[in-house]
Amino acid sequence: MRTFSLKAGEIDKRWVLIDASDMVVGRLAAYIATILRGKHKPEYTPHMDCGDNVVVVNASSVKFTRNKMRDKVYYRHTGYPGGLKSCTPNDMLRAGYAERIIKVAVWRMLGDGPLARRRFKNLKVYSGPEHGHHAQKPVALDFGAMNNKNGRGNNAGR
């Protein structure tokens, strides 16, 4: 029996909608990275972009465990001498960049190569409940119901 290898024409991509309200960022990002890579499919092929497209809504209401909302620090560099910038998740939320929290977490779980960059383009994150992908008919996934640890707050473990 020969080893199965997926061809480019055989890839079947679907759209997945995930509501990030009161969800823990790390667990959510790990699950999104798995979907983007396609590891949840039986026909997973490591060198192909066989993952699904993911739409995340309500990114502004994600949660961190413990005190990470104020203690965790994201660093970036402008490229100029002395240009090291830092901000906390609280700063990002107050400045209106809630999408970046999820995007950075998922990006760091995907890897560094050209295939990871192509897979990352299949992620769409919105801070509110509205998204512009109704024409793609995304399938809603209830991430909070998969495990009690996935969420914090009132609707955790629905």
Swiss-Prot record:
> For this chain's UniProt record, which GO biological process terms are given?
negative regulation of translation; translation
Q: Where is this region: Disordered?
A: 129-158
Which keywords are on file for this protein?
A: Ribonucleoprotein, Ribosomal protein
MF GO annotations: mRNA binding; structural constituent of ribosome
Give the top-rank taxon of the lineage listed in the UniProt record for this protein.
Bacteria
What Pfam families does the database record attribute to this sequence? Answer: Ribosomal_L13
Biased composition of type Low complexity is found at: 144-158
Q: Which InterPro entries does this UniProt record tie to the protein? A: Ribosomal_uL13, Ribosomal_uL13_bac-type, Ribosomal_uL13_sf
The record's listing under SUPFAM superfamilies reads:
Ribosomal protein L13
Does the UniProt entry include the keyword DNA-binding?
A: no
Q: Which GO terms describe its cellular component?
A: cytosolic large ribosomal subunit
Quaternary arrangement and interactors, per the entry?
A: Part of the 50S ribosomal subunit.
Question: What function does this protein fulfil?
Answer: This protein is one of the early assembly proteins of the 50S ribosomal subunit, although it is not seen to bind rRNA by itself. It is important during the early stages of 50S assembly.
Q: Which family does it belong to?
A: Belongs to the universal ribosomal protein uL13 family.
Q: What name does UniProt use for this protein? A: Large ribosomal subunit protein uL13
Name the gene that codes for it. rplM
